[in-house]
Curated annotation (Swiss-Prot):
InterPro entries: ALO_C, FAD-bd_PCMH, FAD-bd_PCMH-like_sf, FAD-bd_PCMH_sub1, FAD-bd_PCMH_sub2, FAD_lactone_oxidase-like, GL_DH, Oxid_FAD_bind_N. NCBIfam families: GLDHase (TIGR01676). It comes from Oryza sativa subsp. japonica. Residues 37-78 form a propeptide. This is L-galactono-1,4-lactone dehydrogenase 2, mitochondrial. Keywords: Membrane, Mitochondrion, Oxidoreductase, Transit peptide, Transmembrane, Transmembrane helix. Residues 1-36 form a transit peptide. It comes from the Eukaryota. Its EC number is 1.3.2.3. Residues 95-266 form the FAD-binding PCMH-type domain. Involved in the biosynthesis of ascorbic acid. GO terms for biological process: L-ascorbic acid biosynthetic process.
Length: 583
């Protein structure tokens, strides 16, 4: 090879006027007579230079530029705009997005029925979308979706029975506004109010309160529009097995078109927020679970701070002191100061004087702080400590209607993984819920995970829906729900990718170290399908241990044999073999 390369250089050199000079130089370099070290080095590097010149000349003559190359203007690359008939649909945190040409919005039950019948006949996809808020994009399908946003009417309110019948496209916030006029409300609420009713029951959403079940338990009856069997009515009396299976059906058994919900009288709650420690929580946990209608803990990693939030109906005998020790500005001022200091460290001094900082809420400030360096553990710890101090200064009481009190500002866009696991009974909690948290916090510190706050822990009673993560045949069983997060406080694609990779590392470590030991299973709206085949096989085996997968797939094949309602995520979580399909 060396001889060939040398011969090529000699041929190229022979075409130039100085070829004889170069030839003598090469001969000198290839001479076998011993030379002093310094002269040898000099001639070695001269040879490298000659080799480089030869390669450059070869490249120039082999790949010549066009004659007008110097006169052409650079044209920046532009993405082609989306066609007018292509809809972009993403979830709340913009972590999952699809583009589709088929996004139907029927405005009545007959139109929905006809759309599904046509899709069934033509073997086309038509995945029920809901509000599309699920963190894992469970409802998204580029092949086609149906959204019931135009089917949002309240059909009937029975004040005596305290029930309401609605079209499934109505949003929770709109339903609550209507129920208010009748002195009614929903029994419990998830953190946000923008979900459609059909979606919130299909994924097994929940609020908090060890005596209160997930929201699917509030469903008394429903109308399910299926591709193969049309519109069917389900209730505890009419086909109870399918009714319970379809209440938390993940949109795979049919499109929920109408729902009758059990309501409760509209009521006020007093919320008590205070800061505790892990030891204090352990001492009082059993009592707090049984005494409080609604309760949750917000754990702050790398601190000994636990924010306890208790909500109960007002008492005739005891009126709490509603005035807080600190005003809102006082409670948040140290967070503003930290942000300004961090701006000086990470950016410029001028930006730290931005008057807009004083108008930001705590969650907005937290997002901006994290955006500066979201994966630096020490930076995240400083933010977590500032959050602990914020909650300490925000201790106190507030009173309002239940739908107002039970909401929660989750912060900005984020990755989230929430698991559900048994925690004993209300009469006899097994304390594994606190063991889980203790192990989780130790894992975070051991692995140096830049885990932001909070780790939210809630409780519910059990559900009779077999596909619910809180499913149980024992009525007094309780379940704990624990959510870990990483915020996506930036629009920078590279930074979001890095946060995403770190989050899945965080989630993987919790899965490996905790899930099996506590029989923990992810919320259906937050479960992510592994890309690795072995990991997917392991996940499918875990799901079979907990859920009636065969019964669910059998119902799918009866109601939707052409898989009109399925998407890639559902197909991977609940694969149906050809033999099962034929049966």
């Amino acid at each position: 090879m060396r001889r060939l390369l040398l011969a090529g250089i000699l041929r190229r050199a022979s075409s130039s006027p100085s070829s004889h000079h170069h030839l003598h130089l090469v001969r000198a370099l290839s001479a076998s007579s011993p030379l002093p070290a310094s002269d040898a080095d000099l001639r070695k590097y001269a040879g490298y230079a000659l080799l480089l010149l030869g390669c450059g000349a070869a490249t120039y003559y082999s790949f010549p530029l066009p004659p007008d190359a110097l006169h052409k203007k650079a044209v920046p690359f532009k993405y082609a705009p989306l066609p007018d008939d292509l809809h972009a649909v993403s979830n709340w945190s913009a972590t999952h997005e699809v583009h589709t040409r088929v996004l139907l919005q029927p405005d009545s039950l007959p139109v929905l029925h006809d759309a599904l019948a046509a899709a069934h006949g033509e073997r086309r996809k038509l995945r029920p979308l809901g509000s599309g808020l699920s963190p894992n994009g469970l409802a998204l399908s580029r092949a086609g979706m149906v959204n019931l946003a135009l089917m949002d009417k309240v059909l009937d309110v029975d004040a005596k029975k305290k029930t309401v019948t609605v079209q499934a496209g109505i949003r929770v916030a709109e339903l609550v506004d209507t129920l208010r006029e009748h002195g009614l409300t929903l029994q419990n609420f998830a953190s946000i109010r923008e979900q459609q009713v059909g979606g919130i029951i299909q994924v097994g959403a929940h609020g908090t309160g060890a005596r209160l079940p997930p929201i699917d338990e509030q469903v008394i009856s429903m109308k399910l529009v299926t591709p193969a069997k049309g519109t069917i009515e389900l209730s505890r009396e009419k086909d109870p097995d399918l009714f319970y299976l379809a209440r938390c059906g993940l949109g795979g058994l049919g499109v929920v078109a109408e729902v009758t919900l059990q309501c409760v009288e509209r009521h006020q709650l007093i919320e008590h927020t205070f800061v505790s420690s892990a030891d204090e929580v352990k001492k009082n946990h059993k009592k707090w679970l049984s005494e409080n209608k609604h309760i949750k803990y917000l754990w702050i990693p790398y601190t000994d701070t636990v924010v306890v939030v208790q909500c109960n109906p007002p008492s005739r005998w005891r009126t709490p002191k509603f005035t807080s020790k600190y005003g809102k500005d006082e409670a948040i001022q140290h967070v503003r100061d930290l942000y300004r200091e961090s701006l000086k460290k990470y950016r410029t001094k001028a930006e730290s004087n931005d008057p807009e900082v004083d108008q930001l809420s705590f969650t907005e400030l937290r997002d901006r702080l994290l955006a500066l360096d979201p994966l630096d553990k020490d930076h995240v710890i400083r933010i977590n400590k500032a959050e602990a101090e914020y909650w300490k200064k925000s201790e106190g009481y507030r009173m309002g209607w239940s739908d107002e009190i039970l909401g929660f500002d989750c912060g900005g866009q984020q990755w989230v993984s929430e698991t559900c696991f048994p925690a004993g009974t209300l009469a006899k909690p097994n304390m594994k819920d606190l063991d889980y948290i203790e192990e989780l916090l130790q894992l975070i510190e051991k692995e140096d995970i830049p885990a932001p706050a909070p780790i939210e822990q809630r409780w519910t009673a059990c559900s009779r829906s077999p596909m619910s993560p809180a499913s149980s045949s024992q009525e007094d069983d309780i379940f704990s729900w624990v959510g870990i997060i990483m915020y996506l406080p930036t629009s920078d694609a590279r930074q979001r990718k890095e946060i995403t990779e770190e989050f899945f590392n965080y989630r993987s470590k919790t899965q490996t170290n905790l899930w099996d030991g506590y029989s923990a299973y992810e919320h259906w709206a937050k479960i992510e399908v592994p890309k690795d085949k072995d990991e997917l096989t392991e996940l499918l085996a875990r799901l079979r241990k907990r859920f009636p997968v065969d019964a669910y797939n059998k119902a799918r094949m009866e109601l939707d044999p052409n898989k009109v309602l399925s998407n890639a995520k559902l197909e991977k979580l609940f694969p149906v073999t050809e033999v099962q399909h034929v049966k």
